[in-house]
């Protein structure tokens, strides 16, 4: 009799995805981040569900309800800080996952890559709306500033912003709808993750060499299950160190002050994982131009398959492209730093130069270096 795991309609899907899946024999630790993102998503949905049981999405009580969760609910402080810092871990894994895809040329799987970019947008939207929910000063002013950017859209901008707000400013209606969207989006993300995996399993995984690995495959279980478990343990270790020792390390002290529309904080800035995009937004003096640059800074990822000029898929054997890649990483660190600084000299000019370099590397330098490396292959 055949094993139930290979015959049962539901179990065989799991079997083909996580047990008998043929995987390349040489994928490194950089391939762990997919499973880590899955774990992050599960942690966020579970902690978020328990937070939603005690949270109230009303401007009068939202801040107090979060305080109540931390003070009065059993282990409420733990759930709240796991959720807040879980978001940071989520983005660390996301950035490393995308970086891996860029370095090893995984973007040549068009559908998988494009759904991944859509997922990135969805996670960013979810995180933004989640940041508004505690209704602290930075929640309120962050929501005001970011939603206000849509008013830069010609003709329909102002109407659109008021429609999103549900009034003439960020208020009760805004908070209620943000809570509703923040609750539903992770489930949409989960569905998209399944589609992401569906397309990935159509082609099979890429590997560090960028070469076809059909002739050398190993079963996912036990080799990569045990490897993923190690990654998960390390992820949970880092998350719990963050939560239990310095839960407010990545947060903003301003968010411990209840939202006050009459008092603007001296420096309005988003969470650390949005700072690079925020720096790009601020580096353009024109409102519409800034908004376009902000959207394009993420949307540009969709152009990578088109801009791939090299005859090799991975950067493993392309030292010049490697140098440019790491300059891009350094540039993103610079943008993240600038995004958290006040708008004054010399930060303005550094931000503008870093923003120009970001788009230059992706649109011009990397493709040009790739073409040059193709020439070197013939020497």
Curated annotation (Swiss-Prot):
GO molecular function term, any single one: ubiquinol-cytochrome-c reductase activity
Topology class, membrane: Multi-pass membrane protein
TM helices/strands, residue ranges: 33-53, 77-98, 113-133, 178-198, 226-246, 288-308, 320-340, 347-367
Main location (coarse class): mitochondrion
Cofactor(s) required, per the database record: heme b
GO CC field: mitochondrial inner membrane; respiratory chain complex III
A GO BP entry: mitochondrial electron transport, ubiquinol to cytochrome c
SS bond list: none
Cofactor binding notes: Binds 2 heme b groups non-covalently.
Annotated heme b b562 binding sites: 83, 182
Binding-site residues, a ubiquinone: 201
Domain of life of the organism encoding this protein: Eukaryota
Pfam family, one: Cytochrom_B_C
InterPro entries documented for this protein: Cyt_b/b6_C (IPR005798), Cyt_b/b6_C_sf (IPR036150), Cyt_b/b6_N (IPR005797), Cytb/b6-like_sf (IPR027387), Cytochrome_b (IPR030689), Cytochrome_b_C_euk/bac (IPR048260), Cytochrome_b_N_euk/bac (IPR048259), Di-haem_cyt_TM (IPR016174)
Record keyword Aminoacyl-tRNA synthetase present: no
Signal peptide segment: none
Binding-site positions, heme b b566: 97, 196
Localisation: Mitochondrion inner membrane
Keywords assigned: Electron transport, Heme, Iron, Membrane, Metal-binding, Mitochondrion, Mitochondrion inner membrane, Respiratory chain, Transmembrane, Transmembrane helix, Transport, Ubiquinone
Family affiliation: Belongs to the cytochrome b family.
Further comment: Heme 1 (or BL or b562) is low-potential and absorbs at about 562 nm, and heme 2 (or BH or b566) is high-potential and absorbs at about 566 nm.
Function: Component of the ubiquinol-cytochrome c reductase complex (complex III or cytochrome b-c1 complex) that is part of the mitochondrial respiratory chain. The b-c1 complex mediates electron transfer from ubiquinol to cytochrome c. Contributes to the generation of a proton gradient across the mitochondrial membrane that is then used for ATP synthesis.
Subunit annotation: The cytochrome bc1 complex contains 11 subunits: 3 respiratory subunits (MT-CYB, CYC1 and UQCRFS1), 2 core proteins (UQCRC1 and UQCRC2) and 6 low-molecular weight proteins (UQCRH/QCR6, UQCRB/QCR7, UQCRQ/QCR8, UQCR10/QCR9, UQCR11/QCR10 and a cleavage product of UQCRFS1). This cytochrome bc1 complex then forms a dimer.
Name of the protein: Cytochrome b
Lineage: Eukaryota, Metazoa, Chordata, Craniata, Vertebrata
Gene: MT-CYB
């Amino acid at each position: 009799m055949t094993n139930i795991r290979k015959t049962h309609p539901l179990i065989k899907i799991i079997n083909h995805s996580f047990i008998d899946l043929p995987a390349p024999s040489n994928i490194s630790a950089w391939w762990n981040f997919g499973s880590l993102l899955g774990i992050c998503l599960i942690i966020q949905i579970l902690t978020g569900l328990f937070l939603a049981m005690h949270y109230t999405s009303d401007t009068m009580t939202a801040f107090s309800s979060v305080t109540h969760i931390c003070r009065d609910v059993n282990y409420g402080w733990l759930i709240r800080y796991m959720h807040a810092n879980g978001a940071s871990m989520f983005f660390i894994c996301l950035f490393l996952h995308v970086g891996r895809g860029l370095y090893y040329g995984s973007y040549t799987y068009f559908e998988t890559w494009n759904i991944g970019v859509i997922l990135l947008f969805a996670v960013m939207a979810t995180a933004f709306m989640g940041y508004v929910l505690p209704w602290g000063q930075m929640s309120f002013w962050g929501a005001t500033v970011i939603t206000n950017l849509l008013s830069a859209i010609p003709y329909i901008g102002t109407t659109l912003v008021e429609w999103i707000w549900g009034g003439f400013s960020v208020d009760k209606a805004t908070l209620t709808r943000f809570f509703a969207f923040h609750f539903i989006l992770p489930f949409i993300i989960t569905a998209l993750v399944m589609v992401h995996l569906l397309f990935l399993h159509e082609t099979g995984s890429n590997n560090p060499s960028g070469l076809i690995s059909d002739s050398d495959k190993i079963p996912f279980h036990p080799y990569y299950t045990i490897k993923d478990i190690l990654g998960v343990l390390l992820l949970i270790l880092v998350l719990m160190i963050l939560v239990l020792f310095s839960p407010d390390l990545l947060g903003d002290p301003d968010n411990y002050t209840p939202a006050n529309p009459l008092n603007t904080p001296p420096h309005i800035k988003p969470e650390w994982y949005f700072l690079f995009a925020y720096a790009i937004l601020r580096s353009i003096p024109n409102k519409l131009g800034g908004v376009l640059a902000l959207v394009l800074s993420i949307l540009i990822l969709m152009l990578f398959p088109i801009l791939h000029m090299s005859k090799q898929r991975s950067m493993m054997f392309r030292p010049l492209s490697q140098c440019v890649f790491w300059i891009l990483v350094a540039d993103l660190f610079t943008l993240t730093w600038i995004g958290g600084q006040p708008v004054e000299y010399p930060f303005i000019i550094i931000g503008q130069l870093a923003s120009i370099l970001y788009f230059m590397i992706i649109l011009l330098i990397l493709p040009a270096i790739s073409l040059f490396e193709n020439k070197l292959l013939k020497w």
